[in-house]
Amino acid sequence: MADGTVILDTAGVKRALTRIAHEILERNKGVDGLVLVGIRTGGVHLAREIVARLEEIEGATVPVGEVDITLYRDDFKGHAPHLPVGKTDIPFSLETKRVVLVDDVLFTGRTIRAAMDAIMDHGRPACIQLAVLVDRGHRELPIRADFVGRNVPTSLKEKIAVLFDAANRPTDVVLEK
């Protein structure tokens, strides 16, 4: 485990993800037309966990995809021509779908902006909603999460780490000073 203070243990993470799943269902009145897209890599694992809960609650399949934002990041443009590009896998149409974009930690908003650009290059959804396990504040862009597991105000020097087990299930959220 990383050094720091555990702010969500395994049980707390499970409760937060279950609550997020229920909030998604309430906001969207079920799963019809709903898809989840996780941001590589932590967001992908969390999206799969949320989809499992949605499917358990609703008894219906919910498509899940993943998006890599490497080519959309604004902090690397022109600076790193040989960035390793991960896989974007969205094996379904986004046209007119309600997309829930999932990430582990919301900080400046720049990752989310990049992910929205990538999603729009794959189609025009009816709407994009944002689900995050942790919102730590310090936004640089006008972006907010629709579904939040835990708000954790931090200093700029602190970091939030979401830890995963060998099966890519979230185990803890740690505040590192």
UniProtKB/Swiss-Prot annotation:
E.C. code: 2.4.2.9
Top-level taxonomic group: Bacteria
Protein's UniProt name: Bifunctional protein PyrR
BP-aspect Gene Ontology terms: regulation of DNA-templated transcription
Family per record: Belongs to the purine/pyrimidine phosphoribosyltransferase family. PyrR subfamily.
GO molecular function terms attached to this record: uracil phosphoribosyltransferase activity
Function according to Swiss-Prot or TrEMBL: Regulates the transcription of the pyrimidine nucleotide (pyr) operon in response to exogenous pyrimidines. Also displays a weak uracil phosphoribosyltransferase activity which is not physiologically significant.
Alphabetical list of InterPro entries matching this protein: PRibTrfase_dom, PRTase-like, PyrR, PyrR_bifunctional
Positions occupied by motif PRPP-binding: 99-111
Keyword Disulfide bond: no
Reactions mediated catalytically: UMP + diphosphate = 5-phospho-alpha-D-ribose 1-diphosphate + uracil
Signal peptide (residue range): none
Record keywords, A-Z: Glycosyltransferase, Transcription, Transcription regulation, Transferase
Keyword Zinc-finger: no
Family matches, as SUPFAM superfamilies: PRTase-like
Any Pfam family: Pribosyltran
Species lineage: Bacteria, Pseudomonadati, Thermodesulfobacteriota, Desulfuromonadia, Geobacterales
